Amino acid sequence: MAAQTTEKLQKLDLNGQSGDAKADAPAAGQAEAGEAEEDSDDEKDDGNAAPEAGAGGAAKKKKRKSKKKKKGGAKVQSSPPRVPVSNLFPNNQYPEGEIVEYTNENSYRTTNEEKRYLDRMNNDFLQEYRQAAEVHRQVRQYAQKNIKPGQTLTEIAEGIEDAVRALTGHQGLEEGDNLKGGMGFPCGLSINHCAAHYTPNAGNKMVLQQGDVMKVDFGAQINGRIVDSAFTMTFDPVYDPLLEAVKDATNTGIREAGIDVRMSDIGAAIQEAMESYEIELNGTMYPVKCIRNLNGHNIDQHVIHGGKSVPIVKGGDQTKMEEGETFAIETFGSTGKGYVREDMETSHYALVPDAPSVPLRLSSAKNLLNVINKNFGTLPFCRRYLDRLGQDKYLLGLNNLVSSGIVQDYPPLCDIKGSYTAQFEHVQIPSHSHP
C-alpha cells in the first residue's frame, strides 16, 4: 500500500472484513466496526454481570444503570438473531465498513466522474448499505459459529434466511414488503464440486457431512441495496490451503480494485495470488485453480448482477471501475478443472430487467408473473420462497416464464465430480473520499 497523501482515494469494504472467514476477527484499522465484531453481545452481558453479583448499593446502581441503557437501545442481539438492527441502532448510525486506501495511481478524478460520484453517494444510499451490511455481519457471525455437520441444508438455509428477515424487519409475506428489505437473493449452500447457485428445494433431505466443503453465499438488502457476501466452511483442516488461497485472492482483488482500474488488471492480480497455492489430498498434490468462467460483478438497486463483470483470471474485460458503483468482489478456487458447467436441479430464478412483453397463454404463468412482480421485482428468488407465499403447482407456469425470456433461471454451477471448490466474497464501493 502506497504512502498516504492528502489526495489519497479510498474505497469502502462494507462487510468490514477483507475476505476473512472469521466474523469475530476484525481487520487492522477497522476501529468502529471491528470492535463490535470482536466482542459478541453475550460476552458483553457476561462482563456486566460480574460486578452486579456483589452485595450492596453499588451493585443496585449498576443494575439500574444497565436497565436504563437497554431502554435506550442496548446493542444486544438475540441467539438466534431476531432483533431488528434498527432497534440496536436507534439513531440509524450503522457501523462503517473497512476503509481500504487506494494507491497513488488512482489519485485523480475528472469533473464529470466526480459529478456522477456525488449523484450516487448520497446519505440514504450509504445508510441503506450500512444497515444491510450490519444485518449480514450479524447473521454471518451467527452462522459461522452454529453451522455444524449433521444439519440438513434446508435447516441451515432457512435459519439464515429467517435471521436476515428478522434483522431487516421485513418478513416478506405481504405484497411489496420484500422490496423494502430482507433477502437480497436465496441462501446458497453449494457443496464440494458445486461452486454456486445451489439451495435446497422443498423436500430436499441432504445433510451436511464432516468432510464437506460448503460455500455459504447469501444477500441482505434494504430498499434494494444488496450486500452480497460469501464464505466457505470446512470441518477438516486438510482443506485449509484451499480456503487460504481463495481468501488471499479475494483480499488481493479488494486491494487492487479502485476508481479507473481496469477489470482485466484485477483479474490478473487475483489469478496470480490464488494459483500460487497448492493442496495435498490423499497423498496427491493439486494446484488451486481459479474457476475461470465465474466472475465478480457490479450491483444495481434491486438487481444483483449489473452490467459489469470482475474477472478472476488475466486477459479479461478492459472496462474500468467508476466512482460510486457497487461491486461484489468474489473469487472461486478449485482442485478440479477450474471450469464450471450447469448441473443438478435448478432452484434460483430472477425476473429479467426490462424483459420483453410476451403474450402468455398459460393462466398459471400470468398469475405467477403477477406474484413475482409484487413480491420480488427483479430480486432473485427460489422455489422455497414461492412455497412460503402459499403458491403451489407453479412449476409449469415458472418454466413457461423461463422459456419466454421473462424469468432467468440460474442452475447450479459445478466443476468435475470429486473436486472441491471454495469461495469468498465481499461488497465494495469505490469512493473519492471517506463519506
From Swiss-Prot:
Its EC number is 3.4.11.18. A divalent metal cation 1 binds at residues 217, 228, 425. This is Methionine aminopeptidase 2-2. Its main location: cytoplasm. It is an enzyme of class 3 (hydrolase). Cotranslationally removes the N-terminal methionine from nascent proteins. The N-terminal methionine is often cleaved when the second residue in the primary sequence is small and uncharged (Met-Ala-, Cys, Gly, Pro, Ser, Thr, or Val). Keywords: Aminopeptidase, Cytoplasm, Hydrolase, Metal-binding, Protease. Residues 59-73 have a biased composition (Basic residues). It comes from the Eukaryota. One of its GO terms (biological process) is proteolysis. One of its GO terms (molecular function) is initiator methionyl aminopeptidase activity. Binds 2 divalent metal cations per subunit. Has a high-affinity and a low affinity metal-binding site. The true nature of the physiological cofactor is under debate. The enzyme is active with cobalt, zinc, manganese or divalent iron ions. Most likely, methionine aminopeptidases function as mononuclear Fe(2+)-metalloproteases under physiological conditions, and the catalytically relevant metal-binding site has been assigned to the histidine-containing high-affinity site. Its cofactor is Co(2+); Zn(2+); Mn(2+); Fe(2+). Belongs to the peptidase M24A family. Methionine aminopeptidase eukaryotic type 2 subfamily. Residues 34-45 have a biased composition (Acidic residues). Substrate binds at residues 197, 305. The keyword Acetylation does not apply. Residues 1-92 are annotated as: Disordered. A divalent metal cation 2 binds at residues 228, 297, 330, 425. Gene3D superfamilies: Creatinase/methionine aminopeptidase superfamily (3.90.230.10), Winged helix-like DNA-binding domain superfamily/Winged helix DNA-binding domain (1.10.10.10). PROSITE patterns: MAP_2 (PS01202). SUPFAM superfamilies: Creatinase/aminopeptidase, Winged helix' DNA-binding domain. It catalyses: Release of N-terminal amino acids, preferentially methionine, from peptides and arylamides. Residues 24-33 have a biased composition (Low complexity).
